[in-house]
């Protein structure tokens, strides 16, 4: 179990051990510090000389324009593979008053437990490691032959025993693709079962331009998971679909506005909304009385998202997005709720649910 009740209250398991939930402070709820996105990379079209150069070269300034419109063209761009750079970059967040990061790189995407611990020691940040499995194309081969119960056991093992001595403290990001395949549903069901038994938050990757949120919540509820401890990630692209987002929040889910600062066209999916649209959507949710269901982050997962390579980095929300929210009418107390209170309450959700939540999973599948 990674959220524990002791004499001082609820604690959250970080890569360096448990910390009181009250010490999470300003928290980014969906980030990547180390990853390997090799399976997202695609080669350049035949005859595209510039594309071939970009695909096989280290990221550099003259590539940025094209990579904003095709970020997976560069093999180098899709991996965060330098711990020293990660320390340098996330230290900017710490210097602005940041305290905690939910690092939701799952197994199969280059999760690096020992490196996360090194980053935590170097920066003083609370880093909470994720677990589980992402989109089907990234699932390790051994997962494909497993049952729901078997996958749930694997997830629970990362939470209770750890990986190389480092325990996960959150489940996710669990991958759901536009096709929402049977394998992805299997893993989601397993994640919900593991959540019910370990009582930790669950973070689900949604394809932001497709409306799978309700189906995801239905699966979680069927397996005994707690919707109030579930984050639906990548809600920025549906920010103008207010009926959809209100319905998800009303069911109790957290809405992950975790694409702040992105300026990318994902060719197979869509264009990331700009920060002005993100801020307007969040301000509307706040006025609708749903600000307590919103979580913020930047989902840094490409080299070009790092400051070193011309991106906005991990401190973007504190440096630029919070002032933008204030211009949209939110107060400092409101943005504190988004960045401090809501992440804390996510980890308190099981305690708050009390006897209302009981696991009713089917362990025979």
Q: What are these language model-derived features?
A:
Residues 114-117, 142, 181-186, 209-224, ...:
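Distinct, well-ordered alpha-helical segments
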Residues 100, 118-122, 126-201, 254, ...:
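Active-site gating/metal-coordination segments in enzymes
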Residues 3-18, 22, 316-365:
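Mid-to-C-terminal alpha-helical segments outside catalytic/metal-binding sites
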């Amino acid at each position: 179990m990674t959220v524990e009740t002791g004499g001082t209250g609820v604690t959250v398991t970080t890569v360096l051990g448990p910390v009181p939930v009250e010490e999470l402070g300003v928290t980014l709820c969906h980030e990547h510090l180390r990853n390997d996105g090799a399976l997202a990379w695609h080669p350049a079209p035949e005859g595209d000389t510039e594309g071939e150069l970009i695909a096989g070269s280290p990221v550099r300034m003259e590539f940025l324009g094209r990579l904003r419109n095709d970020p997976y063209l560069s093999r180098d761009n899709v991996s965060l593979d330098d711990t020293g750079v990660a320390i340098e970059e996330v230290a900017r967040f710490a210097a602005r008053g940041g305290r905690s990061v939910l690092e939701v790189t799952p197994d199969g995407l280059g999760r690096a437990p020992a490196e996360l611990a090194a980053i935590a020691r170097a920066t003083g940040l609370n880093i909470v490691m994720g677990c589980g499995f992402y989109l089907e194309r990234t699932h390790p081969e051994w997962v494909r032959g497993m049952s729901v119960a078997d996958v749930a056991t694997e997830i629970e093992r990362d939470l209770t025993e750890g990986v190389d001595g480092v325990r996960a403290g959150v489940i996710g990001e669990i991958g759901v693709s536009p096709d929402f395949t049977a394998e992805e549903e299997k893993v989601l069901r397993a994640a919900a079962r593991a959540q019910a038994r370990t009582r930790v938050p669950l973070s689900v990757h949604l394809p932001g331009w497709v409306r799978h949120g309700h189906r995801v919540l239905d699966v979680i509820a069927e397996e005994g998971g707690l919707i109030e401890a579930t984050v639906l990630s990548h809600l920025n692209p549906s920010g103008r679909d207010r009926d959809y987002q209100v319905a998800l929040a009303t069911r109790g889910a957290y809405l992950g506005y975790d694409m702040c600062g992105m300026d990318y066209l994902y060719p197979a999916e869509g264009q990331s909304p700009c920060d002005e649209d993100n801020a307007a959507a969040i301000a509307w949710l706040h006025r609708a009385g749903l600000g307590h269901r919103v979580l913020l982050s930047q989902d840094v997962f490409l080299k070009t998202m790092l400051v070193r390579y011309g991106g906005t980095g991990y401190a973007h929300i504190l440096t630029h997005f919070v002032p933008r929210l204030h211009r949209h009418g939110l107060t400092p107390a409101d943005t504190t709720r988004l960045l401090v209170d809501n992440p804390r309450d996510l980890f308190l959700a099981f305690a708050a649910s009390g006897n209302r939540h009981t696991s009713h999973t089917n362990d025979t599948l």
